């Protein structure tokens, strides 16, 4: 079907001509922004939503600590805490991430400067950015509030996420990664369920990508975790590229489909407990690892084996076969899609262009799925008065 010529995006400058977070000449900025947005292939609904977000954003002005009122905590991780806040001057509800860093003023200023690139990241698949500032030893990053939270939170409520839903997630992640790469020459560097956000309108967006090299370096010492989504080449310290993000997406999809972090892979007994039936396939053939004396049983999922120490886990990712989806419960297309994401050699791993034309993505794109309805019933959210079908995302 031929694509309709997109309607020009309508952005009206803020009436008082005020600067958007320190940027001046609003008129010129808006013209440039309008041009950039018209290059994106947006449908009518996406266009209207981006327009509405950017028009709201113009009312925000300079962000200051005193202008925020805390509503609730949304989550913690990645070196920071995220709060749902009200921005009193504009009345907007935002997500505010606070990152505490002991750093020199010059480094701090560089981080704030580097984060300004986020003002340029306008896509239906990327969380909207209001601005960043420093106050009282903390860097604040203010973003669009996504009322469905992150997919790791959704997974906890859902137990497992259905394949049809993960099809829509895959499309959004691929389009988000493609946008970052093609329009901004940046890779995400941290694709995982907690960095994929969703909302009651059925939107799926990436957040927390590596736009500030200085912030990545400053936070490098704060890595604490029991799971890793990093690719084998990245863990080995060799050169890595956007192919590394594709591995992370594949690993995240297996986790969300099966209902637990997939390393070490579940054995036949655990798969039977997870899916309520006997499951065929390689994922079920892994012999149980010997249990270290005195190590506690894992409370994660239904695995009776001890939790891996982080060095064991990283060694497993680098040296053992990659995770797979068990056969018999998922379509062959989905299994093949995941396998192509989880090839250990990055040169052989599928790239974004190949994944976009994969049979699983083509099928998922054509499917009518009420993503918003599924999300709202799963996590107990009220659906907006005009529900969104993810097919139109």
Swiss-Prot record:
The gene is Map2k1. One of its GO terms (cellular component) is early endosome. It is an enzyme of class 2 (transferase). Dual specificity protein kinase which acts as an essential component of the MAP kinase signal transduction pathway. Binding of extracellular ligands such as growth factors, cytokines and hormones to their cell-surface receptors activates RAS and this initiates RAF1 activation. RAF1 then further activates the dual-specificity protein kinases MAP2K1/MEK1 and MAP2K2/MEK2. This is Dual specificity mitogen-activated protein kinase kinase 1. The lineage of its organism: Eukaryota, Metazoa, Chordata, Craniata, Vertebrata. The modification Phosphoserine is found at residues 218, 222, 298. The record marks 8-9 as: Cleavage. The keyword Transmembrane does not apply. It comes from Rattus norvegicus (Rat). Keywords: ATP-binding, Cytoplasm, Cytoskeleton, Kinase, Membrane, Nucleotide-binding, Nucleus, Phosphoprotein, Serine/threonine-protein kinase, Transferase, Tyrosine-protein kinase.
């Amino acid at each position: 079907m031929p694509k309709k010529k997109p309607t020009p995006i309508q952005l009206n400058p803020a009436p008082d001509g005020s600067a958007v977070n320190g940027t001046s000449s609003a008129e010129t900025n808006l013209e440039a922004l309008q041009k950039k947005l018209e290059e994106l292939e947006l449908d009518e609904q996406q266009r209207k939503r981006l327009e509405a977000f950017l028009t709201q954003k113009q009312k925000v002005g300079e962000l200051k600590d005193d202008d925020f009122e805390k509503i609730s905590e949304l989550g913690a991780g990645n070196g920071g805490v995220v709060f749902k806040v009200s921005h009193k001057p504009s009345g907007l509800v935002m997500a505010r991430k606070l990152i505490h860093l002991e750093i020199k003023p010059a480094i701090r200023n560089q981080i704030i400067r580097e984060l300004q690139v986020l003002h340029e990241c306008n896509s239906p698949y990327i969380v909207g950015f209001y601005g960043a500032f420093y106050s009282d030893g903390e860097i604040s990053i203010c973003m669009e509030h996504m009322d469905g939270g992150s997919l790791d939170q959704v997974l906890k409520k859902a137990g497992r996420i259905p394949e049809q839903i993960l099809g829509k997630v895959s499309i959004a992640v691929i389009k988000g990664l493609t946008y970052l790469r093609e329009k901004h020459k940046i890779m995400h560097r941290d694709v995982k369920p907690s960095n994929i956000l969703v909302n009651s309108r059925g939107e799926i967006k990436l957040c927390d990508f590596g736009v500030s090299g200085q912030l990545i370096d400053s936070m490098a010492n704060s890595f604490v975790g029991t799971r890793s989504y990093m690719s084998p080449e990245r863990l080995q310290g060799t050169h890595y590229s956007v192919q590394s993000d594709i591995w992370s997406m594949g690993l995240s999809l297996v986790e969300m489909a099966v209902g637990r972090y997939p390393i070490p892979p579940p054995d036949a007994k655990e798969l039977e407990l997870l899916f309520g039936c006997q499951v065929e396939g390689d994922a079920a053939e892994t012999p149980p690892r010997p249990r270290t004396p005195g190590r506690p049983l894992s409370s994660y999922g239904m695995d009776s084996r001890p939790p891996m120490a982080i060095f064991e886990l990283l060694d497993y990712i680098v040296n053992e076969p990659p995770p797979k989806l068990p056969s018999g419960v998922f379509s062959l297309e989905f299994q093949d899609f995941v396998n192509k994401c989880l090839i250990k050699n990055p040169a052989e791993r599928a790239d974004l262009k190949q994944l976009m034309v994969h049979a699983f993505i083509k099928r998922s794109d054509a499917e009518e799925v009420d993503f918003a309805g599924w999300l709202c019933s799963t996590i107990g959210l009220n659906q907006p008065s005009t529900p969104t079908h993810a097919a139109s995302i």
